[in-house]
């Protein structure tokens, strides 16, 4: 039987070394593959005292924390709250009411005809 054991996501000495070498001017401008090879050479060239100090710092380094996932119920509730349906505008209501008049036209022409009808109506009523 497998058991879930919470574990600290610790980092190793080499990972800490790579993090520290991020701003090394010798590595700037190199391709990623070349940068990895160069970092590896630099790490292998460290003396044992430096490696031991690096391992000690890596052991003391706080581990990366996993992000807690939100339960699905909370996500669904949040999505329901934020996505309230908007009331349709006057134009949308007009289009819905009059789109059937131009049933035989292709969709693009149908929308142009409804828009033209909307503009005519707006001119008649005196609205901008």
From Swiss-Prot:
For bias type Basic and acidic residues, the affected ranges are: 65-76
Which residue stretches belong to region Disordered?
A: 60-87
Compartments where found: Mitochondrion matrix, Kinetoplast; Mitochondrion matrix
GO terms assigned for molecular function: DNA binding
Quote a single Gene Ontology cellular component term: kinetoplast
Signal peptide range equals none
Proregion positions: 1-10
Q: Does the keyword RNA-binding apply?
A: no
SUPFAM superfamilies attached to this UniProt entry = HMG-box (SSF47095)
What keywords does the record list, in alphabetical order? DNA-binding, Kinetoplast, Mitochondrion
| Record has Mitochondrion as a keyword | yes
- How does this chain assemble? Associates with the kinetoplast DNA network.
Give a short account of what the protein does. Histone H1-like DNA-binding protein involved in the organization and segregation of kinetoplast DNA (kDNA). The mitochondrial DNA of kinetoplastid protozoa consists of about 5,000 minicircles and 20 to 30 maxicircles. These circular DNAs are held together by catenation into a highly organized compact disk structure referred to as a kinetoplast DNA (kDNA) network. Binds preferentially to a specific fragment of minicircle DNA and is able to compact kDNA networks through DNA charge neutralization and condensation.
**What family does the database annotate?**
Belongs to the KAP family.
PANTHER family noted in UniProt: DNA-ASSOCIATED PROTEIN, PUTATIVE-RELATED, KINETOPLAST DNA-ASSOCIATED PROTEIN
Annotated protein name in UniProt: Kinetoplast-associated protein 4
Which source organism does the UniProt entry give? Crithidia fasciculata
Q: Which taxonomic lineage does the organism of this UniProt entry have?
A: Eukaryota, Discoba, Euglenozoa, Kinetoplastea, Metakinetoplastina
> Corresponding gene?
KAP4
């Amino acid at each position: 039987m497998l058991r879930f054991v919470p574990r600290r996501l610790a980092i190793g000495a080499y990972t800490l070394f790579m993090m520290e070498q991020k701003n090394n001017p010798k590595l700037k401008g190199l391709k990623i593959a070349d940068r990895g090879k160069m970092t590896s050479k630099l790490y292998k060239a460290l003396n044992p005292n430096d490696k031991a100090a690096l391992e000690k710092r890596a052991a003391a380094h706080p581990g990366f924390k996993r992000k807690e996932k939100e339960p699905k119920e909370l996500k669904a509730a949040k999505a329901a709250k934020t996505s309230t349906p908007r009331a349709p505008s006057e134009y949308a209501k007009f289009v819905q009411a009059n789109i059937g008049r131009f049933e035989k036209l292709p969709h693009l022409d149908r929308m142009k005809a409804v828009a033209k009808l909307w503009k005519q109506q707006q001119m008649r009523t005196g609205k901008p």
